[in-house]
């Protein structure tokens, strides 16, 4: 019996994954720590206030850039997920009881940090009758109420595709409704066994039909081909996805899916161009791009391309600024 570091029995797939050593990253997988006044201030606020962000706790390489933009990401619903995806670092297990005060605390953290844009994501809560829909919706409402000048992007699980649960989130009116497909149909079941590709597309379509700006993400390097990436982009656009981010898979631990390939920046530029051609209103592609990277900028870009006026209280998000991790920026260095 193989034992995981936290003391539990390792799953068969984890033991098989662990037979492959952690891969050496190529030269283009790198970032520079460029701190500025906003990052320094936020760092101090987070430390003094005992606040928790995904940015810090996941060791995101883009924290310096995003915090300079006054953007951050928060995880709700606990630290354990009821589902297991082969790329995801979040633990799988029995979650803690629902914390109904969490929306208020997240909203207060966003206010304390003075964020311009906040991405709120969370774990799947199949243990709850509503799959956690109330928690997601209430966190949007609480954040908007406490921070009228802050954009809110909500990144949700699929709630098993149930319209009545998704509607709770739609009614809270986030600036962006995001659900990540992550990979292509052929390998989807092995990578995300508790999800379904077509169901994820339908979740995005439901968000589109509710009149929201929709968003998804594709992770490359888990066994897909270039042709399958192009097909998935077409599927997403056909489902009504407005914004797409495309990123390189980085293996969190030996127990996770091995990296099948390292996609060069030049290829990311090609995928970005194809996404633009397909009509996505916002595109961000690069090895270290993450789904919440420069999220406020992408939302503003999508609004303009859709011909929708940006609300006055969020006009500060409408600015053109370089994105260091975008593949085209990497090649220009």
From Swiss-Prot:
Q: Kindly list the positions annotated as binding [4Fe-4S] cluster 2.
A: 81, 85, 88
Q: How and how many cofactors are bound, per the record note?
A: Binds 2 [4Fe-4S] clusters per subunit. One cluster is coordinated with 3 cysteines and an exchangeable S-adenosyl-L-methionine.
- Pathway involvement of the protein, from the record: Protein modification; protein lipoylation via endogenous pathway; protein N(6)-(lipoyl)lysine from octanoyl-[acyl-carrier-protein]: step 2/2
Q: Which GO terms describe its molecular function?
A: 4 iron, 4 sulfur cluster binding; lipoate synthase activity; metal ion binding
A GO cellular-component term linked to this record? cytoplasm
Is Iron among this UniProt entry's keywords?
yes
Coarse class of the primary localization is cytoplasm
EC number in record: 2.8.1.8
| Keyword tags | 4Fe-4S, Cytoplasm, Iron, Iron-sulfur, Metal-binding, S-adenosyl-L-methionine, Transferase
Cofactor entry: [4Fe-4S] cluster
Q: Where in the cell is it found?
A: Cytoplasm
Q: Which reaction does it catalyse?
A: [[Fe-S] cluster scaffold protein carrying a second [4Fe-4S](2+) cluster] + N(6)-octanoyl-L-lysyl-[protein] + 2 oxidized [2Fe-2S]-[ferredoxin] + 2 S-adenosyl-L-methionine + 4 H(+) = [[Fe-S] cluster scaffold protein] + N(6)-[(R)-dihydrolipoyl]-L-lysyl-[protein] + 4 Fe(3+) + 2 hydrogen sulfide + 2 5'-deoxyadenosine + 2 L-methionine + 2 reduced [2Fe-2S]-[ferredoxin]
State where [4Fe-4S] cluster 1 binds.
55, 60, 66, 292
* InterPro entries xref list: Aldolase_TIM, Elp3/MiaA/NifB-like_rSAM, LIAS_N, Lipoyl_synth, rSAM
- Outline the extent of the Radical SAM core domain: 67-281
Report the family membership. Answer: Belongs to the radical SAM superfamily. Lipoyl synthase family.
The name under which this protein is listed is Lipoyl synthase
- Source organism of this protein record: Kineococcus radiotolerans (strain ATCC BAA-149 / DSM 14245 / SRS30216)
């Amino acid at each position: 019996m193989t034992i995981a570091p936290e003391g539990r029995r390792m799953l068969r797939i984890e033991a098989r994954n662990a037979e492959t050593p952690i891969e050496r990253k190529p030269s283009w997988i790198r970032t520079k720590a460029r701190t500025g006044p906003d990052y320094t201030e936020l760092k101090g606020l987070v430390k003094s206030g005992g606040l928790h962000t995904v940015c810090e706790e996941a060791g995101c390489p883009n924290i310096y850039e995003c915090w300079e933009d006054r953007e951050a990401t928060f995880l709700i619903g606990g630290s354990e997920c009821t589902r297991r995806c082969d790329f995801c670092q979040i633990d799988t297990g029995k979650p803690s009881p629902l914390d109904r005060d969490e929306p208020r605390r997240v909203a207060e953290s966003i206010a304390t940090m003075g964020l311009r844009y906040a991405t709120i994501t969370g774990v799947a809560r199949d243990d709850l009758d509503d799959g956690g829909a109330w928690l997601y919706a209430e966190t949007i409402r609480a954040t908007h109420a406490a921070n009228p000048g802050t954009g809110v992007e909500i990144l949700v699980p699929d709630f098993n595709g149930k319209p009545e649960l998704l509607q709770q989130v739609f009614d809270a009116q986030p600036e962006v409704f995001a659900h990540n497909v992550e990979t292509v149909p052929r390998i989807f079941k092995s990578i995300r066994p508790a999800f379904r590709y077509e169901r994820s597309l339908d979740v995005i379509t439901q968000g589109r039909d509710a009149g929201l700006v929709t968003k998804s993400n594709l992770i490359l390097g888990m066994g897909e081909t270039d042709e399958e990436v192009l097909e998935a982009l077409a599927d997403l656009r056909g489902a009504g996805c407005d914004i797409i981010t495309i990123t390189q898979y980085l293996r969190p631990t030996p127990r996770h899916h091995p990296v099948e390939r390292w996609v060069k920046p030049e290829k990311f530029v090609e995928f970005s161009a194809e996404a633009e051609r397909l009509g996505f209103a916002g595109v961000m592609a690069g090895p270290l791009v993450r789904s919440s990277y420069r999220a406020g900028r992408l939302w503003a870009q999508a609004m303009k391309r859709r011909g929708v006026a940006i609300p006055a209280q969020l006009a500060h998000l409408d600015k053109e600024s370089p994105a260091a991790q975008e593949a085209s920026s990497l090649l220009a260095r």
